[in-house]
C-alpha cells in the first residue's frame, strides 16, 4: 500500500527560469518552484504505534520534482545533534551571566537521502518549511521556502546557480602543516588486531562548543533565536560531512557575548586565534567540559581569510579551537567553512593540486568555492588517519553513556541506550556481524560488538593491549577478559624521565625546551645558550618569571630557565630570540613541568624546584 502511494501521489512543479529573486541565501539565477508534499508513512508491519506527543516527527518523507522528475526525500531527525547536557549562555546588559538548559530534543533538524539514489545525502531544517541542501545524482541542490503568499511554494536550485556575494575569493589562513613538527610514523600495521588500527576504526564523538562574539550578535539584530537557529543549521550540516569519517558532532554549548567580547576579536587571525585559545583554556574549559570550541564573528579578517585553526590539535586545552568569519548568508556555505577548520584540528592540511573531488572542490581546499563541498579528498583522509595514529586523541572516544541519552530509545541511531545491547545503525548501513540491526540485540553466541576489547564478537583474552602507550608519558591499557570495554585511559606518573632523559613527564606530556622552540620558531630552532636566560633576572618588559597584580617579578638566578624561553635559529645571527603576546601572558614562556636542571622542573609558580617536591 505504501509503495502504491509513492507511485500515485503526483506533484505539479512550476519551473521558472531566466530571472532572479532575493532569497535568504542571496541572489539565485536559475531555480525551480516546487510544492513538496508530505507522504504519510507507517512503521514496519503497517501498525501505527502511539508515540509521545512531539512537535516534529522522528522520520518524514516528502515528494517533489527535481528537473521535472519526481523524487522522494527521506528524512530522519538528527537525534545526536545536541549533547545530553546541552546548555546556552548569554549576558545581561549589565554583564551578568545567564545560563539555561533549553529543551532541544524535539528539534527540527534532519539528515536524509533521496530514494533510489545510494550516493545521495541531505541536511534539512524543517522548522519553517524545508531549508537546506541535498545531493542527487552527483549534483548538489539547495531548497528553501519561497517567501510569497503561497506558503507551500519552495525554490530548488543547483548550488552553482547561487551568485557570489563577493567577487573576491575566500580562503583559509592556515599555512602550517601541524601544531608541532611532523613526526615520522614508525609503526607496523600488518596485524589487523593492532591497537592503533583499532583506534582508527572506532566511532568518534566531538562535543562542540560554539562561541558567538558581540559583532555577530549585533549583526543578527541582537536576536538570540535567530543566532541559535543559524548555529543549529550549520552544525547539523557539518555532521553530514563528518559521517563520512565515522565522526559524530554533538553541540554541547553555545555562548553568546551579548554584553561585550571576552577577548579582543581583531582582523589579525593569528592574534585572535591565540587569544581565543587562551580564553578557552583558562575560562571556558574550567566551567564547561567539551572537546572543541569555535568562535563565530562578523569581524572582517585581514585579506581574503575567513577561517583559521590549529592543525592536529584536538583535545589540547589551548589549541583545540578555530575562528570563523560569518562571511555568507548561506548556512550551508558557512557549514563548509566550519567543516574545513575542524578538519585542520583533526590533522588535515590543505589539498594540493593532486587532491581532487568531483564535481566540486574538496572540503580541505584552501580556496572556498561558491558551491558547498561534498567530500574529503583521499589526501585529507590520509592526513587524518596519520594524525589519529600519531596522537591517539582520547577525548573523542567518549561516547555518551546509556543513561546520558535523554531522547527516547531508538534502534538504528548508532547509540546504545538503556535496554539495548548494541546499535550498528539502520539495516541498510549496518556492517556488524555481531549486532542485529533490526532489534539492536547481539546475535546468538555474540558477547560484544564494537568495543575495544571485542574481537570477532567475543571478549579479547586478558592481557591483550587495547590502548597502546603513545609515548614515554603514557601507559598501555589491557583487556581484562571479562568485559568488552578497555579500562580507563591512564598516564605515566608526573616526574618520570622522558625523551631520553631530556625531560620529565607532566600531565601526560614531556615538555622540553627544544620542542617548545620548534613550535615557536620552526624546525630549525633550538634552545639558546644559558647566558640568554640571565635576561629574565631583569624583570623588565617581557623578561620575567611571573606577574603578580600586574607587576613583573624578575627571576632569581636559579629560576631563570622558568621565565621567558630563548631560542636560536640556524639561519639567524641573533642568539637570544624570544616571543611574547600582548593578549596572552603565557605565550613564549617556558612551559610548566619543563626540566630546568638535573632532577629539577618549573612548577606552577615558575620556580625551579626539586622533582621530588614538585608534584
UniProtKB/Swiss-Prot annotation:
Q: List the disulfide bonds.
A: 315-395, 355-379, 357-362, 411-440, 422-435, 424-430, 434-457, 448-454, 453-479, 466-486, 473-505, 498-510, 517-567, 532-576, 545-555, 562-602, 596-608
Q: Which GO terms describe its cellular component?
A: extracellular region; plasma membrane
Q: Can you tell me which residues form the catalytic site? A: 341
Q: Where does Zn(2+) bind?
A: 340, 344, 350
Instruction: Fetch the Pfam families from UniProt.
Output: ADAM_CR (PF08516), Disintegrin (PF00200), Pep_M12B_propep (PF01562), Reprolysin (PF01421)
Q: Start and end of every Disintegrin domain?
A: 408-494
Which UniProt keywords are present, listed alphabetically?
Calcium, Disulfide bond, Hemostasis impairing toxin, Hydrolase, Metal-binding, Metalloprotease, Platelet aggregation activating toxin, Protease, Secreted, Signal, Toxin, Zinc, Zymogen
Q: Which residues form the signal peptide?
A: 1-20
InterPro entries cross-referenced by the UniProt entry = ADAM_Cys-rich, Disintegrin_dom, Disintegrin_dom_sf, MetalloPept_cat_dom_sf, Peptidase_M12B, Peptidase_M12B_N, Reprolysin_adamalysin
Instruction: Identify the main location.
Output: secreted
Q: How is the cofactor bound?
A: Binds 1 zinc ion per subunit.
Which residues of the sequence carry a binding annotation for Ca(2+)? Answer: 410, 413, 415, 417, 423
Q: In which tissues is it expressed?
A: Expressed by the venom gland.
Q: Does this entry carry the keyword S-adenosyl-L-methionine? A: no
The entry assigns this protein to a family as follows: Belongs to the venom metalloproteinase (M12B) family. P-III subfamily. P-IIIa sub-subfamily.
- Physiological role: Snake venom zinc metalloprotease that may induce platelet aggregation.
Q: What is this protein called?
A: Zinc metalloproteinase-disintegrin-like
| Source species of the chain | Cerberus rynchops
Amino acid at each position: 500500500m505504501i509503495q502504491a502511494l509513492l507511485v500515485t501521489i503526483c506533484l505539479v512543479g512550476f519551473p521558472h527560469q531566466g530571472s532572479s529573486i532575493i532569497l535568504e541565501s542571496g541572489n539565485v539565477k536559475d531555480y525551480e518552484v516546487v510544492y513538496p508534499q508530505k507522504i504519510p508513512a507507517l512503521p514496519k508491519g503497517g501498525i501505527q504505534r502511539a508515540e509521545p506527543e512531539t512537535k516534529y516527527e522522528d522520520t518524514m518523507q516528502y515528494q517533489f520534482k527535481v528537473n521535472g522528475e519526481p523524487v522522494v526525500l527521506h528524512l530522519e531527525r538528527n537525534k545526536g545533534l545536541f549533547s545530553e547536557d546541552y546548555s546556552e549562555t548569554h549576558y545581561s546588559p549589565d554583564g551578568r551571566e545567564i545560563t539555561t538548559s533549553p529543551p532541544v530534543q524535539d528539534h527540527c533538524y534532519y539528515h536524509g537521502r533521496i530514494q533510489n539514489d545510494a550516493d545521495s545525502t541531505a541536511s534539512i531544517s524543517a522548522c519553517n518549511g524545508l531549508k537546506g541542501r541535498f545531493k542527487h545524482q552527483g549534483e548538489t541542490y539547495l531548497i528553501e521556502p519561497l517567501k510569497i503568499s503561497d506558503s507551500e511554494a519552495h525554490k530548488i536550485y543547483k548550488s552553482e546557480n547561487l551568485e557570489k556575494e563577493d567577487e573576491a575569493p575566500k580562503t583559509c589562513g592556515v599555512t602550517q602543516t601541524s601544531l608541532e613538527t611532523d613526526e615520522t610514523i614508525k609503526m607496523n600495521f600488518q596485524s589487523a588486531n593492532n591497537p592503533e588500527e583499532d583506534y582508527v576504526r572506532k566511532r568518534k564523538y566531538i562535543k562542540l562548543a560554539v562561541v558567538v562574539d558581540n559583532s555577530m550578535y549585533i549583526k543578527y539584530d541582537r536576536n538570540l533565536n535567530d543566532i541559535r537557529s543559524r548555529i543549529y543549521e550549520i552544525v547539523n550540516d557539518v555532521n553530514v560531512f563528518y559521517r563520512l569519517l565515522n565522526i559524530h558532532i554533538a553541540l554541547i554549548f553555545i555562548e553568546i557575548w551579548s554584553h561585550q567580547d571576552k577577548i579582543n576579536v581583531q582582523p589579525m587571525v593569528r592574534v585572535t586565534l591565540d587569544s581565543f585559545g587562551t580564553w578557552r583554556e583558562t575560562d571556558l574549559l574550567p566551567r564547561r567540559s567539551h572537546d572543541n570550541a569555535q568562535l563565530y564573528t562578523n569581524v572582517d579578517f585581514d585579506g581574503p581569510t575567513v577561517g583559521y585553526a590549529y592543525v592536529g590539535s584536538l583535545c589540547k586545552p589551548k589549541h583545540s579551537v578555530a575562528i570563523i568569519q560569518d562571511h555568507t548568508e548561506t548556512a550551508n556555505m558557512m557549514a563548509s567553512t566550519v567543516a574545513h577548520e575542524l578538519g585542520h584540528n583533526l590533522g588535515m592540511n590543505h589539498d594540493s593540486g593532486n587532491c581532487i573531488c568531483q564535481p566540486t572542490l574538496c572540503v580541505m581546499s584552501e580556496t572556498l568555492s561558491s558551491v558547498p563541498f561534498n567530500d574529503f579528498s583521499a589526501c585529507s583522509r590520509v592526513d587524518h588517519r596519520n594524525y589519529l595514529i600519531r596522537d591517539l586523541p582520547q577525548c573523542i572516544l567518549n561516547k555518551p553513556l546509556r543513561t546520558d541519552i535523554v531522547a527516547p530509545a531508538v534502534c538504528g541511531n548508532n547509540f546504545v541506550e538503556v535496554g539495548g545491547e548494541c546499535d550498528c545503525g539502520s539495516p541498510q548501513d549496518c556492517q556488524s556481524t555481531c549486532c542485529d540491526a533490526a532489534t539492536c540485540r547481539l546475535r546468538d553466541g555474540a558477547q560484544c560488538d564494537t568495543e575495544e576489547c571485542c574481537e570477532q564478537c567475543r571478549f579479547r583474552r586478558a592481557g591483550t593491549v587495547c590502548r597502546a602507550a603513545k609515548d614515554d608519558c603514557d601507559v598501555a591499557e589491557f583487556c581484562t577478559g571479562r568485559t568488552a570495554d578497555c579500562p580507563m585511559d591512564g598516564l605515566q606518573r608526573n616526574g618520570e624521565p622522558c625523551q631520553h632523559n631530556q625531560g620529565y613527564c607532566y600531565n601526560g606530556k614531556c615538555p622540553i625546551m627544544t620542542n617548545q622552540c620548534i613550535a615557536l620558531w620552526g624546525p630549525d630552532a633550538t634552545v639558546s645558550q644559558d647566558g640568554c636566560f640571565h635576561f629574565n633576572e631583569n624583570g623588565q618588559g617581557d623578561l620575567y618569571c611571573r606577574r603578580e597584580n600586574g607587576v613583573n617579578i624578575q627571576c632569581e638566578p636559579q629560576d631563570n630557565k622558568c621565565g621567558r624561553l630563548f631560542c636560536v635559529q640556524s639561519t639567524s645571527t641573533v642568539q637570544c630570540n624570544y616571543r611574547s603576546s600582548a593578549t596572552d601572558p603565557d605565550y613564549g614562556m617556558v612551559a610548566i613541568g619543563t626540566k630546568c636542571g638535573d632532577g629539577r622542573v618549573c612548577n606552577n609558580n615558575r620556580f625551579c624546584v626539586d622533582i621530588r617536591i614538585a608534584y
